[in-house]
Amino acid sequence: MRLSEDENYFEIEEKLLNEGYRFICGVDEAGRGPLAGPVFAAAVVMDRKRIIEGVRDSKKLTPKKREKLFEEIIKESIAYSVAMVDSKVIDEININNATFLAMKNAIENLKIEPDIVLVDGYKIPNLGFNQRAIIKGDRKSYSIACASILAKVSRDRYIVEISSKYPLYKFEKHKGYGTKEHIEILQKYGPCEIHRISFLKNILSL
């Protein structure tokens, strides 16, 4: 019997459940690339009996669909956690280390201990849990896809919320990404306190 797309997304988790793993955690990040704002990470343990239809890599979903799925994932999850690392720390330790730190914090803040962690991309250094890295995991793993939605929506909401503090920069429109408009604003006004200075060296004379 051919699996549906939703069932295919759970194939990795199904194999792990059959191997005896109970609490399977997916973890993913949002906001590696922007010129401003924190990097976010989410960790989530989903319930096998409550598969949510339509879960995909967050980048393939409309904002409206992401928002709807965000609420469903929170409601149906066994446990979830969201963490962020701000722009100052990103500048201090670099974006790769900041991303790993956000992921590690999200996992460690879960209300339960996962039996195994599925990571999108590469293994998290010094993580005290069994983990498997899955390249393009947000396209292959249901748990990672759920985490990608939680991370993306959480970051977008945060950026929209703080945008009122920095009205000149129009963060609510571009979410901190390096759009033409954002770069023109940067060249006119310079960076604000939430910009990642280490990301701006090729854009501004810093």
Swiss-Prot record:
GO terms for cellular component: cytoplasm; ribonuclease H2 complex. This is Ribonuclease HII. A divalent metal cation binds at D28, E29, D120. Disulfide bonds: none annotated. It catalyses: Endonucleolytic cleavage to 5'-phosphomonoester. Its main location: cytoplasm. InterPro entries: RNase_HII (IPR022898), RNase_HII/HIII (IPR001352), RNase_HII/HIII_dom (IPR024567), RNaseH-like_sf (IPR012337), RNaseH_sf (IPR036397). Manganese or magnesium. Binds 1 divalent metal ion per monomer in the absence of substrate. May bind a second metal ion after substrate binding. Its cofactor is Mn(2+); Mg(2+). Keywords: Cytoplasm, Endonuclease, Hydrolase, Manganese, Metal-binding, Nuclease. Belongs to the RNase HII family. Gene3D superfamilies: Ribonuclease H-like superfamily/Ribonuclease H (3.30.420.10). It comes from Caldicellulosiruptor bescii (strain ATCC BAA-1888 / DSM 6725 / KCTC 15123 / Z-1320). It is found in: Cytoplasm. GO terms for molecular function: manganese ion binding; RNA binding; RNA-DNA hybrid ribonuclease activity. Endonuclease that specifically degrades the RNA of RNA-DNA hybrids.
